[in-house]
């Protein structure tokens, strides 16, 4: 990745402000820059290809989709020593206290993770039923589920030796906690 550092802007192609628009960055071993940008709403169709997605920032400043269907991908990082990309995602609200689980997942190039048409693989979003069966059919199941509305924000893979051996190679995920669950949850690592 090359950027004209005489400017403070490497890309202005981040879409319209609003919703879950403040984002995180990660760079792979080759210096390619990835940006996670959340949706512009809770459960809605959208026409901005860079929202609810992870994109690559091209040398010319334009964004190229890497993976889509990620409602609010917040924590983004590469597994240490690899170019394996992972994110933690805050899923949709309004489906009840126990749906839809937030998650951590390995992000694959070209993959679709469900939002807004499906969740947990091919479980169709009731309010958008029948709208995009093609996307529902290819929606990926996340790798690790967290309790709904726990709001995972930070993600760090642990390779140190300070903690017991069973933690090595695992992930620490910081949860912000719920704002809308009947019984608060989250607020933990």
State where each predicted segment sits.
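Short glycine-/Asp-/Thr-/Trp-enriched loop segments that recur within the blades
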Residues: 14-22, 67
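Conserved beta-strand positions that form and line the central face of beta-propeller blades
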Residues: 10, 65-66
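Conserved donor sugar-nucleotide recognition element shared by glycan-biosynthetic enzymes
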Residues: 18, 46-47
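Positively charged, low-complexity, intrinsically disordered RNA-binding extensions
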Residues: 25
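Single conserved hydrophobic/aromatic residue that forms the stacking wall/gate
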Residues: 1-10
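Beta-propeller domain segments
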Residues: 22, 39-42, 49-52, 57-59, ...
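Acidic/polar residues in short coil/turn loops that connect beta-strands
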Residues: 4, 28-30, 59-60, 81
């Amino acid at each position: 990745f090359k950027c004209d550092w005489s400017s403070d802007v490497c890309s202005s192609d981040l879409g319209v402000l609003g919703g879950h628009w403040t984002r995180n960055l990660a760079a792979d071993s080759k210096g390619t820059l990835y940006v996670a940008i959340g949706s512009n709403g809770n459960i809605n169709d959208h026409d901005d290809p860079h929202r609810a997605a992870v994109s690559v920032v091209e040398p010319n400043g334009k964004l190229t989709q890497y993976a889509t269907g990620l409602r609010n991908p917040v924590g983004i990082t590469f597994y240490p020593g690899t170019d394996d990309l992972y994110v933690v995602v805050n899923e949709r609200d309004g489906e009840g206290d126990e749906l839809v689980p937030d998650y951590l997942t390995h992000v694959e190039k070209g993959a679709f993770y469900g939002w807004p048409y499906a969740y947990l693989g091919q479980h169709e979003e009731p309010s958008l039923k029948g709208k995009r069966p093609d996307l529902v059919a290819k929606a990926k199941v996340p790798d690790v589920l967290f309790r709904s509305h726990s709001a995972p924000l930070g993600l760090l893979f642990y390779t140190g030796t300070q903690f017991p051996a069973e933690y090595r190679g695992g992930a620490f995920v910081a949860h912000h906690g719920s704002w809308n669950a009947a019984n608060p949850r989250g607020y933990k690592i």
